[in-house]
Amino acid sequence: MVAIKNLVLVALTAVTALAVPSPLEARAVTWTCLNDQKNPKTNKYETKRLLYNQNKAESNSHHAPLSDGKTGSSYPHWFTNGYDGDGKLPKGRTPIKFGKSDCDRPPKHSKDGNGKTDHYLLEFPTFPDGHDYKFDSKKPKENPGPARVIYTYPNKVFCGIIAHTKENQGELKLCSH
């Protein structure tokens, strides 16, 4: 009886000691955007919290063509982030800081947007459900919604998600994550 108890104890100890931890799964980063939308029942604006999955937004940017406004919908197109066409920041403008060097440097954007040394930001619609925006839709083009995934030209580095503060118009703000 003692031998059986010892055998069970040794077996349990061996299983515990030899157990290999399983790798942790990386959690998807969720971005939260605040957007004022009109309530059709009250006809008043209400602030909505819109949630975006970073993996889905990055996937949207990878499915987008690497062009500046040359599609039926004009997306993706150059996100100036407050800069002028020469990469200068006009007085009184403050660019959004994404926290990545590729995303925060002043742009270099040639006339056609395809120069060998060009580097700039592109914006492309992204949605809470992660579906791909139909970039070649013409009239009527798909509603782009309030949020945009921002990424770099030419290497498609993910910068972040921004959204209009009121429906699909007005100021663009960096969403939180």
From Swiss-Prot:
Active site: H77, E123 (proton acceptor), H164 (proton donor)
Biased amino acid composition, Basic and acidic residues: 99-119
Main location: secreted
Superkingdom assignment: Eukaryota
Enzyme class: lyase
Signal peptide interval: 1-27
EC number: 4.6.1.23
GO molecular function: lyase activity; RNA binding; RNA endonuclease activity; rRNA endonuclease activity
GO BP: negative regulation of cytoplasmic translation
Family annotation (Pfam families): Ribonuclease
Compartmental location: Secreted
Alphabetical keyword list: Disulfide bond, Hydrolase, Lyase, Nuclease, Protein synthesis inhibitor, Secreted, Signal
Disulfide pattern: C33-C175, C103-C159
GO CC, any one term: extracellular region
InterPro entries: Fun_ribotoxin, N1-like, Ribonuclease/ribotoxin, RNase_U2
Region of interest (Disordered), residue spans: 86-119
Catalytic activity from the UniProt record: a 28S rRNA containing guanosine-adenosine pair + H2O = an [RNA fragment]-3'-adenosine-3'-phosphate + a 5'-a hydroxy-guanosine-3'-[RNA fragment]
Function: Alpha-sarcin is specific for purines in both single- and double-stranded RNA. Its toxic action on eukaryotic cells is the result of cleavage of a single phosphodiester bond in the 60S subunit of ribosomes. Inhibits both the EFl (elongation factor 1)-dependent binding of aminoacyl-tRNA and the GTP-dependent binding of EF2 (elongation factor 2) to ribosomes.
Protein name per its UniProtKB record: Ribonuclease alpha-sarcin
Organism field: Aspergillus giganteus
